[in-house]
Amino acid sequence: MISTFALFWALCIVCIINMARYYSSLRVLLMILRDCDPLLYQYVDGGGFFTSHGQPSKQIRLVGYIYAQRYLDHHDPEFIRRCERVRGQFLLTTALCGLIVISLIAMMMWY
């Protein structure tokens, strides 16, 4: 029989790996954004996005921009492709984090 704790930790490791992939894809997206749309890059604070003085409201703007699929009208196909990839990874990571929370609650109730 598979251990519940082993399964939970495996799920956590998969989630952490997907978070790292999401972070990496977001960095590449910002590099592409700097070249193809400097105004949007400034609008989402691309230069300070991953720094300690980054502005969360501007970071949320980029997440909202990608989540609402407003990138579909953009002129650069590479940017559109990267946004679709980041959106997919964001949805996957969100679902995995939700599954971890549900699993943690279930384990606390079970044990």
From Swiss-Prot:
Topology within the bilayer: Multi-pass membrane protein
UniProt keyword terms in alphabetical order: Cell inner membrane, Cell membrane, Membrane, Transmembrane, Transmembrane helix
Transmembrane segments: 1-21, 90-110
One GO CC annotation: plasma membrane
Domain of life: Bacteria
Predominant place of localization: membrane
Short name of any one Pfam family annotated for the protein: UspB
Compartment(s) where it occurs, according to its Swiss-Prot or TrEMBL record: Cell inner membrane
Family as reported in the entry's similarity comment: Belongs to the universal stress protein B family.
Protein name: Universal stress protein B
Species whose genome carries this gene: Pectobacterium atrosepticum (strain SCRI 1043 / ATCC BAA-672) (Erwinia carotovora subsp. atroseptica)
Encoding gene per record: uspB
